Amino acid sequence: MTELSALSAAPARTRDGVLRFYFGPMDCGKSTLALQMNYNHRRQGRHGLVLTKHDRSGGPRVTSRIGLGSDAVEVVDDLDLVALVRKHERVDYVICDEACFYTVAQIEQLADLTDDFGIDVYAFGLASDFRSQMFPAAQRLFELADEISRLQVEVLCWCGRPGRLNARVVGGALVRTGEQVVIGDIGDAPIRYQVLCRRHYRSGSLGQD
């Protein structure tokens, strides 16, 4: 086979995909934007998948704090995202909510979907955990994404300064040790999360006095 015929036999791609990462603290509208983006793409006749992991609803759904929601595929650690997409006849884009909780291998798979299959991938998530340390998946997204956007919806600390860090609160006190991923803010759960400015995150002040 000549070089020219080999190129002719290669699968044609009409366009390149893009991998975008949208990040910000809690309450900045990440899930709301993910749902809006899915709605906009579907209106244009595009076919997509919506993925999530550890959504506050406890089920395979993307839900926002303002009451919006959509069914989604629940991402578990051993789910191969390339294999998932290839099971479908047509996928133009993938919405990945709570992408900070994915495995690093799954972030690599998202890049594969973009580079090898021309699929647009839109990932949404936190950058850092309750210890103010970056999630491994978020770090890999910062390294691989074509475009990175910090969401501009203003989230405030109790003092009025911009909220930047996600504090874990147990029994009314800020904690800095424990498992990286613990779901809170659900019903009467003893664990909740609060967005703080850097000053009050470091001092541990929750503004309750």
Cite the ranges covered by each PLM segment.
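Short recognition patches in nucleic-acid-associated and regulatory proteins
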Residues: 153-185
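Short basic (Lys/Arg) and small-residue
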Residues: 145
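Walker B catalytic acidic pair
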Residues: 97-99, 125-126
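A short acidic, amphipathic alpha-helical/loop segment
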Residues: 37, 105-113, 137
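Residue-level preference for the first positions of well-ordered beta-strands
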Residues: 19-21, 47-49, 92-95, 120-122
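Conserved P-loop
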Residues: 2-85, 129-140, 153, 177-209
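Catalytic P-loop NTPase motifs of RecA-like helicase/translocase cores
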Residues: 101-103, 130
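Sensor-1/coupling segment of RecA-like P-loop NTPase cores
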Residues: 114-137
